[in-house]
Design a protein with these regions (language model features):
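Short alpha-helical donor nucleotide-sugar binding micro-motif in glycosyltransferases
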Residues: 235-240
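Acidic anion/phosphate-binding donor-loop and adjacent secondary structure
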Residues: 162-177, 214-216
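Donor nucleotide-sugar binding/catalytic pocket of nucleotide-sugar-dependent glycosyltransferases
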Residues: 124-169
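Aromatic "clamp/platform" in nucleotide-sugar-dependent glycosyltransferases that forms part
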Residues: 248
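Nucleotide-activated donor-binding/catalytic signature segment of Leloir-type glycosyltransferases, i.e.
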Residues: 213-232
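Nucleotide-sugar donor phosphate/pyrophosphate-binding loop at the beta->alpha transition
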Residues: 98, 109-128
Length: 255
């Protein structure tokens, strides 16, 4: 049985597209009889990311070497460009171990929206991180083309799917006639464009995030219902008149 080691700075209990993607990948790989080890922040001492307490950052990541060697995996994948990812990259290069990485989102645009850091700075760091990988997985053809224009190399398309047993259309169309946003409630999602736009229909927001409390106070006419999963989430989609997704920093957008 082949063993795959995944190193990720994004893992449960975080709720976001990266975590949804990677937990699903691990589940499906194990169903196909792969052995999968995951190294994640929950295995280390962590501190909450400033201004984003939902995200835990590992700080004693020098213990990563022992965990990699203990896994003795046949393949290695580094999912996120965080402290664990950077340390895992260094280990692989030092020991001449080929590995793959993944670009989940338009991170330079995300960082610019949240912190005002120039796009070229972040793109340079990402190229340094990813261009040493054997292959880098990307979500869409359009994002792949953008990254190639920016100088990223060895890119491979890795799209997404959904569980059609849970997510299927309502034959009658939206029953409750509201506008729906699903995703992280944060400034980089450009969600305020949705919240402030005029509409004759009520608005529903599914999800949480650092801007939830402030937006809920600012837009009391919007129904913020928090995180939802599985059938409950699917029901919100089925009952909506229209799904609105204003983000300018997403690639595929797992919501």
């Amino acid at each position: 049985m082949k063993k795959i080691l995944i190193i990720t700075d994004a893992w449960e209990p975080q709720v976001n597209g990266v975590v949804t993607t990677m937990t699903t990948v691990v589940q499906k790989l194990r169903e196909k009889n792969f052995a999968v080890d995951v190294i994640h922040p929950g295995m280390f001492h962590t501190f909450p990311l400033p201004n984003y307490p939902e995200i835990s950052v590992a700080w004693n990541f020098w213990d990563l070497k022992k965990k990699i060697e203990k896994s003795n995996a046949d393949f290695m994948h580094i999912s996120v460009e965080g402290p664990l990812g950077v340390t895992g990259r260094h280990y692989c290069l030092e020991h001449e171990i080929p590995y793959t990485t993944c670009i989940h989102t338009k991170f330079p645009e995300y960082v610019y929206e949240r912190f005002g850091i120039g796009l070229d700075v972040t793109k340079g760091l990402l190229k340094w991180f990813h261009n040493s990988a054997a292959k880098t997985l990307v979500n869409t053809e359009s994002h792949k083309a953008e990254l190639e224009d920016d100088g990223f190399t060895d890119l491979v398309l890795w799209s997404r799917g959904f569980d059609e047993k849970i997510f299927y259309p309502c034959p009658e169309g939206g029953k409750q006639k509201y506008l729906l946003y699903v995703g992280r409630v944060a400034v980089e999602k450009n969600i305020e464009e949705f919240l402030k736009m005029p509409s004759e229909l009520p608005k529903v927001v599914v999800g949480g995030g650092p801007s939830l409390k402030s937006y809920a106070r600012k837009y009391p006419d919007v129904d913020f219902v928090g995180f939802k999963k599985g059938k409950e989430l699917a029901d919100y989609y089925r009952d909506a008149a229209c799904f609105v997704f204003p983000s300018l920093t997403d690639t595929f957008g797992i919501v």
